[in-house]
Amino acid sequence: MNEDKKTSRGRPKKFDRSHVLAIAQQSYWEHGINQMSINELCKLANVSKPGIYREFGGEDGLTCAVLEHYESRVLSLMLDFLSTETPFNEGLEKLAFYSTSEDRDSDMPKGCLFANMKALRLNLGEATAEQIDRTYEKVINSFEQWINRAKEKAEFKAAHMDSRFAAIYIYAQISFAQSQMMRGEKSEDVRAILRVALSVFG
């Protein structure tokens, strides 16, 4: 029994990748990706800096992995919503509400981590910047397909508008609104402004 204790005491702790990604995502999202150092993340996740570098190859690898994690668990919910058969105007209203909602009983931070990362793209590493570009294209393509389906059903008011341009416009308005949320603006005010910006389609 004593020998078992000695053996287990000498074993290195297993690096929990999922735990580190969850802590990093929450911290970057809540405070801003430019406000959290890798040393602070190591303390929060209770891991060593060499462990981070072994697992992710460095800070750039970590931020890239965090964005992939965020895309699969948060952004995917919004993109899945765009593929439903909800009428376009109703969907646009729900999107505006979802983008500017805050749940005080939830530990989910306000705003959008991806919008924050995209705004600071030039300050991030190469791998993260490339992932930002891939994620952005995925988001815009999803919006574009949603708009094209609305056009086919004659639900899109600005039928003459190029679908990709409209997709970029809608995402830009949502992204700005979420950035305002991260800066602490009242959700009601941000939502009202977003609704006005999107009213060209309603």
Segments (PLM) and residue ranges:
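Conserved hydrophobic residue
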Residues: 34, 156, 183-186
